[in-house]
């Protein structure tokens, strides 16, 4: 305990420096919207999002220190606090809310209103922050030195290395601009195809790769291990399952297909089989993966909840000094009560008082679990999808048992699941950000206000983003697979209507169990089973680039800086492609995409088009090397 009391942050508690300023709010809100939109687009495409804390911190340091000539590390910390909330809220929203759009596309309900999406996102985000605030002293202060908080600590280190902020910010902006340009060339002007495919005559499987910079960046950031698991899942689906389905079921019409499998393959190729059958196998694998990860985490979850509640009963350390000031507890309790009443009474959230009670109970439980688990194992290993699956199963069973079935009950279940998923994601992000602030000497109260500002900004933007993407391409398509949302939809329909192709679902479940038995992390493997193999292959390329960096013969310090530069550049590429992806969605809604499409005018033959795609992909890879591997090589001369 003495060691904890003697901890000295970078900025002393008695020193007051700018934090929550007009500059930090404006920059933070902009980054919250940008990274929220970019991660919404990315998550719907590849089934995962990437943390915005470090790129937001680097951008803020670059702008505040280099452009504005100010030296305020706590101001930069507030920027990343506000900005990272956008990514976390987007992650929680896209894993669940697209299910409402999918039901609307099937004619089961009207499309959800912008107000409905906004209300759910805002309530979930605000509850996530408010539930976490009382836990700060227990998790951040009392367990300092016990909980490592990987991302929170790394973000603090980036901010402390502020003198490098300008150069690092330029790396992020370079990735943003370059990826945006390539995205516009590939999907806007359509000068080259977005995929390179290889097919073998007489064999129903196919392999290939997409050439998108953001997808490749996901592989680099996740690393070779996770990338290889996803690629393995894609190989199982596209080179084993699809050929087997076509070979043994060619003359059969199997539900949910409506034509003989042979005819489906002849007219639509492997993609038709993927759309009718593989998605259900992938969803079964994802469900099993989420449940397995939750079961494996149960001892830790129980211990986490128990320890957090015990710690909350302890004496608050630090008195009323600046670095230990939280939002007033009375205000927090009143706000939680008001939000609970809104969940019950607002027509945009179709749940009863029972549903509101479920939200509060599960919300506080999973907020507590998420807040501590990110401290133990990091945000990347926080089983948010497993928490959402557990909540959905229990909520759907309760709603059906109490007579709230049909589409109304399904809407209520997804609303509850969405709020809980967002609560868990935001609580984890808040916990990481408060750890960063604790190390730097930030004022917790100002950070908590910053989190609320970020939640409001991203919550107001996410509904528009979802509407745009649905109008442009639709969810559950090859363009936007939305694997988690498809899974949540499947779970609710399975409980309410019992009309799923259970044989396909259980094939996926047993694939996931087999992966777990041989020691393969189930969730990345399951996402790989669900997603197109071309997307998985592109992710694998990014993972191989990272592997090459890790295996290089450079000195340890140079290797770490090189890998870090690559991470920043790839973070920028994800943001850049996401921004242009949203812009192209706007173009598609207003039919501008047809005007700028040059593919028909060029009329390239398939071999020439493939060569063009290979050249573009090679350029994307070379530019990653330029801003990481070769950048440090030049500096060392």
Residue ranges and their predicted role:
Residues 1-637:
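Alpha-helical multipass membrane-protein architecture
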